[in-house]
From Swiss-Prot:
The cysteine framework is VI/VII (C-C-CC-C-C). The lineage of its organism: Eukaryota, Metazoa, Spiralia, Lophotrochozoa, Mollusca. This is Conotoxin Cal6.27. Keywords: Disulfide bond, Knottin, Neurotoxin, Secreted, Signal, Toxin. It comes from Californiconus californicus. One of its GO terms (cellular component) is extracellular region.
């Protein structure tokens, strides 16, 4: 169940990062293809926070 949530969140984050690539690049969000796995001020972190907690 948790894995499904993480996969959905990852796809959502990737989509948002693609749409908001300019902002993501500025904050280093997509620097190493991390797709915002590291909590920072980029893209949507609330999705992962909801999944992890």
């Amino acid at each position: 169940m948790k894995l499904t949530c993480v996969l959905i969140a990852a796809m959502l984050l990737l989509a948002v990062c693609q749409l908001d690539s300019a902002d993501a690049t500025e904050t280093g969000c997509k620097k190493d293809g991390s797709w915002c796995w590291i909590p920072s001020e980029c893209c949507i972190e609330s999705c992962l926070i909801t999944c992890w907690y």
